[in-house]
Design a protein with these regions (language model features):
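A conserved segment at the C-terminal end of the G1
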Residues: 1
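Gly/charged, well-structured mid-domain segments that form the phosphate/adenylate-handling core
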Residues: 133, 144-149, 182-224
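A short acidic, amphipathic alpha-helical/loop segment
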Residues: 19-24, 71, 196, 232-236, ...
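Glycine/charged-rich beta-loop-alpha catalytic/anionic-binding loops adjacent to active sites
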Residues: 91, 156-165, 211-217
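Active-site beta-alpha connecting loops in nucleotide-dependent enzymes
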Residues: 203, 221-300
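A conserved, hydrophobic alpha-helical segment in the catalytic core
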Residues: 24-34, 123-137, 164-198
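Flexible active-site lid/hinge loop adjacent to a nucleotide/diphosphate
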Residues: 4-6, 10-116
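Cys/His-rich short segments
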Residues: 87-153, 166, 277
């Protein structure tokens, strides 16, 4: 009847809609995992979305931000905040060649940034030798990712804790670190969080594995016409062990009636990751299959 019947709400808000929602809903905490480019017809450049959020986030909202994201880490500078992040791992492949790097220059003085390490795109740690700008330190820090045991170690404001790794990608680890940071700020203990995390699984609509005969079939979803999302999946395919055949089904069902979408996103996407000796075959499907073939040929596949 127009009255709140719960004490707590967890809301996922569309960035574009935030300007309409935040005047009426003032979150206690706001978690932003990252800001990247989206499809051309929707959000396009990350700075466009940054400006919308930066102007409309309520002053009293405490932010939980990714210290490794040089875009979202700068949101609403006057607000109270904590940061989460992932330390550089000993066996981690960094600074992979990529088309999109949205923060090559210092956001404060415009000089070229020096990256201490770049995990992918603009995710990593950087500093400016001219004005002193640098990536913030993480309050909630993933210090160790143990792929063999499927566990991660985190420093929760200086206190060490061990958690199950939910998912296998670095994106999954960032999502988990962000969730742990928010819940820690709410006052949940590491032991409470451990018990809850043990029950978590990645939904199969996003990622699934199935054994068919002697073949391991992996399905991974990327956001439609999104160059960063597709590039991350391509990188994951490249880094997966063993010989691989890749089937690209990149058509967006939402565009089924209008298949003449802007194809420029294909040339922002790192198809070069598929130019790898471990990939023995690439199959393209859908109405844009010939466009994908041309892009693959340009990538040397």
């Amino acid at each position: 009847r127009g009255k709140t019947v719960k004490d707590l709400a967890v809301l996922e808000l569309d960035e574009r809609s935030s300007r309409l929602i935040y005047p009426y809903v003032h979150p206690t905490y706001l978690l932003c995992t990252n800001l990247f480019r989206d499809s051309y017809k929707r959000n396009a450049h990350s700075e466009f979305i940054f400006d919308i959020l930066d102007k409309h986030i309520p002053k009293q909202t405490k932010l939980v931000l990714n210290a490794d994201d040089l875009v979202s880490a700068r949101l609403a500078k006057g607000n109270d905040r904590v940061y989460f992040g992932i330390e550089k791992q000993d066996n981690e492949v960094l600074n992979e060649n990529t088309i999109i790097i949205d923060t090559p220059l210092c956001p404060e003085c415009g000089s070229r940034l020096e990256y201490d390490f770049r995990r992918y795109h603009h995710i990593g740690s950087a500093h400016c030798t001219k004005c002193g700008f640098r990536s913030p330190k993480a309050d909630y820090d993933v210090t160790k990712v143990n792929e063999s045991t499927g566990r991660i170690t985190m420093s929760l404001k200086g206190k060490q804790a061990d958690f199950k790794a939910v998912g296998t990608s670095v994106t999954d680890t960032y999502n988990l670190a962000g969730a742990i940071a928010v819940l820690s700020e709410f006052g949940l203990s590491a032991e409470q969080l451990k018990k809850s995390v043990e029950k978590l699984e990645i939904v199969k609509s996003r990622y699934d594995e199935e054994k068919i005969g002697d073949k391991q079939v992996i399905m991974s979803v990327a956001k439609g016409q999104n160059p960063v999302a597709c590039s991350r999946v391509f990188s994951s395919i490249k880094n997966h062990t063993g010989k691989k055949a890749v089937v690209l089904m990149l058509d967006d069902l939402g565009d089924a009636e209008e298949t003449s979408e802007n194809t420029a996103w294909i040339y922002d996407t790192d198809f070069e990751f598929l130019n790898d000796d471990s990939i023995t075959q690439v199959i393209c499907s859908g109405v844009r299959r010939t466009d994908y073939k041309v892009r693959l040929l340009l990538a040397g596949v």
